[in-house]
Amino acid sequence: MCSEFLSELHWEDGFAIPVANQENKILEDQLAKLREEKSNLQDQLHDYEERINSMTSHLKNVNQEFLFTQSLYKARESEIESEEHFKAIAERELGRVKNETQLLEKEMAIIRERKSQMENNIFKTTQKLDDLKCQMNWDQQALEAWLEESAHKDSDSLTLQKYSQQDDNKIRALTLQLEKLTMEYNEKRKLLDSELTETLSAQLELDKAAQDFRKIHLERQELIQQWENTIEQMQRRDQEIDNCALALSRIKQEAREKEGVVKEKIKFLENEVENNIEYERKISVAERKVSKCRMDYQRHEGNRSQLKDELDTLKTTLNRTSSDLQALRKNISKVKKDIFDETLRLQKLKHHNEVVKHKLKMITEKTLSIEEKATNMEDMLKEEEKGLKEVEVQLGIVKDVLFKKVQELQNEIAKEKALVSEIEGTRSSLKHLNKQLHKLDFETLKQQEIMYSQDFYIQQVERRMSRLKGEINSEEKQALEAKILELKKTMDEKKSTLSLLESQIKKLHNDLYFIKKSNGKNNDEKESLMNKISELNLFIDRSEKELSKAKAVKEDMMIEDNLLKLQVKRARELLYSKAEEVLSLEKRKQQLGKDMEERAEEIKVHKAMLTSQIRCVEQQRKTMSSEFHERLSKIDKLKNRYEILTVVMLPPEGEEEKTQSYYVIKAAQEKEELQREGDSLDAKINKAEKEIYALQNTLQVLNSCNSNYKQSFKKVTPSSDEYALKIQLEEQKRTADERYRCKQRQIRELQEDIQSMENTFEVIGHLANNAKEKLTEKQTLAFQLRKETEEQKPKLQRITKQCGRLRREIRILKQTDNETLEEQDIQLREIIQFHKDIDQMLVNAMENAEIHAIFKTYFEQNGLELPTARGPSSRSSSQSSSLSSFRSLEDVTLQSPPTAKVIQLRFPEPPPATNDSSRSASSGSNSNIPKEKKLSK
């Protein structure tokens, strides 16, 4: 504003800007105050106007709401009146329906009474009818007597006819009355049904009307509800509008206030922009320095975090390996115990086998009978079988235990892998999060820098303004001095942190070295344990082979025993066959006697049966003839009765008379029926007579058979043909029996051979399965080891890179290009560790007796001592020796390296005719040593 005003006045730049005097300054202040008051009053005026407008709109809305509520109130009143009216109508209808129901109930009661009366009347009439029928149904004998008398007394019959006609007339009259009453009842029922249908139709119409009314009522209620909802929505919107208006007024006021503040700040900014330009150069220089320091700090922080992560991983691996080691040691101790127990049992079994063999020899030497030998052999076999079963059971238990342990080991390894993968995943996620955190920190730092630069720029502008005004601030100088002091302090702090970090890095290097060392030791222990496990597996294989040999010996013994048993069986069978022949002949004799007695009893019973049947048939014939005579007499009686009935049962007056031909036909039909019955009875009699003749014939046949059977039991003479045939058949039977026994023996022998072959096949299969399982286990173990080595390779590369970087840094810090004392110490320790590893390998290899002898000869030839297994004391001594070597290295730097004595070992090749066990043992012990190896000492 000032510059524009001066340009309008054509003020030159060389001259100073005119400044107002004291009075003008006071006037300017007053003017500014008045302007502020004016602006405030204008703002208040605007607020009041807006409030008035909002109040007027609110009043309009309130009036509208009032009108809506009044109309709603009226609608509700009309609805209440209509509901009361409907309620009164419903009450009236209810009263009317109750009256109608009472009337209907009364009518129903009257109808029930009438119905009961009618039923009583019907029951009485039916009783009377039944009595009349009973009177009519006279007894046949009385009727016959009455007919005989009626022949003499026609007058009595006429009177009877009259009475019967009277009774018939009465019955007809009663039936007519009944029909009339039923007709009336049906008409009344029809009237009742029609009235019911009318009432139902009226009720349905009423229900429809009520439904329509309910629908209309519901629609009306819905309309009122919609009305209420709209009113509520309008009220809500009015409230929202009021709130919005208030908020708008408040926002406008705030906007005005902010506009004033912004104007003031713009003025202040214009003044400060000029001051900021001067300090930008200094800030850029300081920023460069700070950015360099930050970059160094971030690099050191990254290195520190990386080293910390590696330390954590190494610690976890150490803990895991130590726990695995303990578990393996426990398992190995258990397996050793089991193996020791098994060896003891094997020795016992061998001793037992020797005792059994001795007994066998003793038994064979003695001249005992075949049966005694067989019993002894059976006892011995039983004892041997028991022992073998026990051994098999124990072996099975041991195998199960071993299998379980192997499975547990595999499960633990799988768990370990899963945990390692989880840890790696969490580490990667942690690294990712750390990176994100670093990024965020960097961004916040950038924002702080920007803020700082802005503040600095504002301060520069303020200073420029003060300089333009001609004011010099001592506070600025003090602030700058304070900032310089702060920066110096921060520099000192950074230096101290740098020194701390360097010391920590050194410590970490030392820790890393010790961890590597311990890791190497753990690996050695692991390898030794694996070798021991392989040796145990070999021992188990050997024991299994010995067991298979024992089984083969046992099978041979069993075969010999079976042969002896066969001989005994043959002798017994010969004995039994002779005894059986004698017994069979005696039994046959007894059986024939029993059969004779049974046959005689059967014949007696059969005779008695036939006689009883004949009696029954004669009785039936007599009964039939008596029935026939009775029926003839009945026919005569029926004829007489028929003649009487024809006279009595004359048709009444008004009915047609039945002709004589009708009765003749009826009589002929009855005669035919009787004739048929007579024919059927004759046929039955003829049939019974034929059966009697047939039974007599069968009796004769049975008698002839019995006589033949008696003759067959007579003694046969040696000169007869039957005797010769008997002898021939017996010889054929004997030859057939011998053939059958031979075949049975052959079948048994074949079955035994098959069984033995199956047993051997099962044993071989079992051995093959075991071998396959072991092979798979070994393959999985090898695969796991390969995997572990592959996993460790990137870590090793990373560590080597880190070591190289750290070496370079240390050399830079020490300002040397040659190897430092620390590096030389590390190399020395590595060489010592390498020597220890070779010693340990040699010790592990020398556990085998053959290899130990070879090593001993070669070492004695070269005048060297054999390496021994080291304990914890040797480790401590090695550490002390490494320290002493480190000290000695300080003095000796340019000496020549010591000469190494080389031993060339040549192992003798195994002969070709060696068994599998020796091969497996040699392969297990020499798994880590080649045929030719050079050892530097």
Curated annotation (Swiss-Prot):
Region Disordered: start-end pairs: 866-937
Tissues in which the UniProt entry reports expression: Strongly expressed in tissues rich in ciliated cells. Expressed in olfactory and vomeronasal sensory neurons and the respiratory epithelium. Expressed in node cells carrying motile cilia, in upper and lower airways, and in ependymal and choroid plexus cells.
Keyword field contains Transport: no
Ranges annotated as biased composition (Low complexity): 873-887, 915-928
Matching Pfam families: CCDC39
Chief localization: cytoplasm
Keywords: Cell projection, Cilium, Coiled coil, Cytoplasm, Cytoskeleton, Phosphoprotein
Phosphoserine: residues bearing it: 888, 896
GO annotation (BP), single: locomotion
Gene Ontology CC: 9+2 motile cilium; axoneme; cytosol; extracellular region; glial cell projection
Entry keyword Transmembrane helix: no
UniProt xrefs under InterPro entries: CCDC39
Family recorded in the similarity comment: Belongs to the CCDC39 family.
Name of this protein: Coiled-coil domain-containing protein 39
Gene coding for it: Ccdc39
